[in-house]
Each structure stands twice: as C-alpha cells, then as structure tokens.
Amino acid sequence: MRAVHGTLVSGYVGAPGSLKKTECDTLEFAFDGIVGDRHRGFTRAAWDLTDKQPGGTERRNERQWSAVAHEDLAAVSKQLGLPAALRAGDVAVNLSISGVSEFSRLPRGTVLTFEGGVVLIVEEYNPPCSRMSQHIADHYHRVNEEPLGQSDFIEASKFCRGLVGAVEVPGIVSIGEGVMIKQEVLPKWLRA
C-alpha cells in the first residue's frame, strides 16, 4: 500500500491517576512510551473486563501512546451537539493527527513515521470506555445547554476513537510535524 501523509495537530501528556492531559509543543518518546505520560511503561496491569488476562496480571504495554484523527474529534463533537470541538487532550489522547481518512480503522502493524525520525507502530483500536463517556457527560454540554447522557460519547465515537500502540524508534516530535503512515500489507518474506 502506498503511504498516506498527515500532520500532527496537537500533543498531550497525562499525569498518573487523571484523565486530564496537558497540551505540549513537543513530545519526547522513549522506548517505553511518552516521557511524563501516565501510560508510559514496558508493562501494565491487565484490566478486568477488556483484557485476555485476569485483572491485575502484569502484561506487555500495548498502550504506550494514543492517537485520534483531528477530523474525527470534530465529527464526534458535532454529533454530540457541543459548542466547540473536543481536543485530543479532552478525551485523554496523546496525539491528534489530521489528513488521514479512516484513521481509526488502520490495522495492527501500521507504521507512523514522523519527519524527525520517531517511529510508532499501531497495536490496536482504542475503544471508547464508560469512564471517559461519564467524564465527557460531567464536563460538557450541548449548544442548547442540554446535558449529555452517560453513554453519548461511547455511541458517537464507537468507530472513530483512535488507536494505541508502541514506540519503535524514540525521539522528539513537534506540533506541525508531518507523519507518513504506511500499512504493512505483506510480510517481508512474502514480498517479491
């Protein structure tokens, strides 16, 4: 497959124990994730309901970073009837990337290569969770001042919540930096 090019619109780092993320002009990626972010680490504890392992089991961390399409955030915000578009940090996501249609549908193994040399690999889709949906309902309202329901965010973002993955090549990325996105169609050993 040919490469698709996008642009990093915004970047965020989240403190441990909080859904809130702080906007940054640059993000430093290490082999174990984004420096200063709560999801940094080579391993993480398994979640009770969504992981294959029993809750609390130490497992490989496939969530060293998270990303969402800038355009998808705007569409979700419009569907929810919000007065302004949600930002990646509002939904606890590290990276907002523009210019890539169907971003959330990129498969495992897709490689994101930033102009400065940082390389990230997609591990899986980042499904919307009830905790984030409740957070959005508690902190945002519709243009007409009507409250949001507990599961409105889940419904609006169920196919466009973004992706999570791991770091392949560390370094620093800056807002406005270009990113080349390439899906791995065939394993190297099958290519002619």
Where do the PLM segments sit?
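Electropositive, beta-rich accessory/interaction domains or terminal extensions
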Residues: 1-115, 124, 190-192
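Short, charged beta-turn/beta-strand-edge "cap" motif at the junction between a beta-strand
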Residues: 118-120, 126, 180-189
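Short alpha-helix capping/helix-loop boundary micro-motifs
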Residues: 97-99, 162-171
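Glycine-rich active-site loops that engage anionic ligands at enzyme catalytic sites
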Residues: 106-167
